[in-house]
Amino acid sequence: MVDLVSSLPDDLLGHILSLLTTKEAALTSILSKRWRYLIAFVPYLEFDDSAFLNPEEGKQTREGTRQSFIDFVDRVLALHGDSPIRKFSLKCKTGVDLDLLNQWICNVLQRGVLLIDLSMDLGHRCMFIEIFMSRTLVELKLGSGCRIAFGPEHISALPMLKTLTLDSVSWSDSGQLERLLSACPALEALNLANVHGSYPNATVSIASLKTLTIKSVSLSGPAHVFSFDTPNLLCLNYTALFEDDYPLVNLEYLVEAQIKFVLTDRLIKLVSVRKNGLLMLSEVQKLIRGISSVRKLYLSPGTLQVLGQCSQAMPVFNNLTFLVIESSMDIRWQAMPVLLKNCPRLETLVIKGGLVHCVAADCGDACTCISREEKGRSLASCPVKRLEIREFQGTLREMEMIKHFYYCFLCLKEMEIYVKDGRPQFLAPLASDSNPFKHLLGRNVIIKVHGSLT
C-alpha cells in the first residue's frame, strides 16, 4: 500500500500531507527516500509547542520541551528548503529566544507566505518589525503574548493584507494601532479581541473595511473611546461595557450589526445616579444612531436593558427588516414598544432566550406583564410577518404571550416556536398535542412548533 501511495505525483502527496498536522507530516520522512523531502510540498506549516508535552510519556522539563520544539521547527524549515508557503502558524509558550523566532518569521516571509498566525510568550520583549513590512501577507493573526512596538520609520505598506486579527496584543504606546491600520490600504476584515487597556483611545479609519469585530470588555481600567470612520463597513460585531464613548460613528452603508453591551453591578449603580446615567446613555445613543441604517440587527440582553433607559431618543431604523432580540429573566422589556414602532419595514422578529422577562409597568403592549385597558399599539403598527421564538419553555406566562402576539401582530403570517432542550419537567404543557396552539382562531397564521412540550 505504501508503494502504491508513493507512486502518486509529488504535488498530490503534498496535498495529502497537508491534511495531517505538521508534526505527523514530518514523521513520514522516515518511511523511505521517496518521502524524505515531500514535506517541501506541504504549503501549510503549523507549529505548536504544546504538542511536545506527551502525557503518556510524562511531562518533559520546560527546557527539554523548548529544545525539542526548536529542533523540530529548524528541521522542518530546512527540509522545506525554498518551497513556497501559504500559511505559517506558530504557537509557542515555552519562551523561545526572540532572535530565533525572528529568524523563523524572516524565513517564511522571504518565501512569500500569505497567512501568519502567531501566539507566543514574549514577556516584556517586543516582536520583530519585519512582519509589518511584508508585501505578500493576505492575513495576519497576532494572539496572546505578542507585544508590538515600532515607529513610523519601521512600518511600510502592507498592500495585500485583507484580514487582521489582534487578540490580547499589547502595545508600547496608544498610537501604534492607528499607525498599523494606516499601512493597510486594502484591509477588509479587522478583529480586535480582549482589548483591555491596550488602546483605550482608538480610531478605526479604513475606507476599504467591510467587517469589524471588537470585543472590548475589561472590568478594571478606564473606559475606551472608539471612533469609527468606516463608511463602507457592511458588518459590525461589537461587545463592550456600555460606558465606552464614540466621538465619531461613520457607518453609512452598514448592513448587519451585533451590539452586545455588558452590564456590571458597578455600571448599574452609576446609571442610577442621574448625572452619570445621562452622560453614559448619551454616549450609547451616538453608537445607536450611527448604526440606524442597518438591515439586520442583533441586540443582547444587556443592550436591550440599556436601550430601555434611553428609549425616548431611539432613532428610526428605516432599513431594518430582520431583528434579533436576546432576552433573559432579569431583563426588562421597556425598550420594546419604541423599538418596534421605530422599525417601519421590519419583516422578521426573532426572540431568543424565551419570553419570560422581568415584570415591569413600562413594557407597553409588547407583553402581558401587567393587564390594563390601554397599553399602546406598538405591536399592531409593527409590519412584522414572521415571528420566531427560541428557547421556549411552555410556562403559562409564555403561553399567554404567544396568544398575545398571535392577535396583536396584525401583519403576522408565520410563527415558529423552538422548544428549549432539557426544559424543567414541572413545566406541564397546556395540551398533550404536539401543537398546543391549534385553539387560536380567527387569523391566517401558520404556527410551527419544533420540539415537544409533552
UniProtKB/Swiss-Prot annotation:
Specify the domain of life of the species encoding this protein: Eukaryota
The record ties this protein, via InterPro entries, to: F-box-like_dom_sf (IPR036047), F-box_AtFBL13-like (IPR053781), F-box_dom (IPR001810), FBD (IPR006566), FBL60-like (IPR055294), LRR_dom_sf (IPR032675), LRR_FXL15/At3g58940/PEG3-like (IPR055411)
Record keywords: rRNA processing included?
no
Tell me yes or no: is ATP-binding among this UniProt entry's keywords.
no
Record-annotated F-box domain positions? 2-48
Gene3D superfamilies in the cross-refs:
1.20.1280.50, Ribonuclease Inhibitor
Alphabetically sorted, this entry's keywords are:
Leucine-rich repeat, Repeat
**Name of the protein this chain belongs to:** Putative F-box/LRR-repeat protein At3g58880
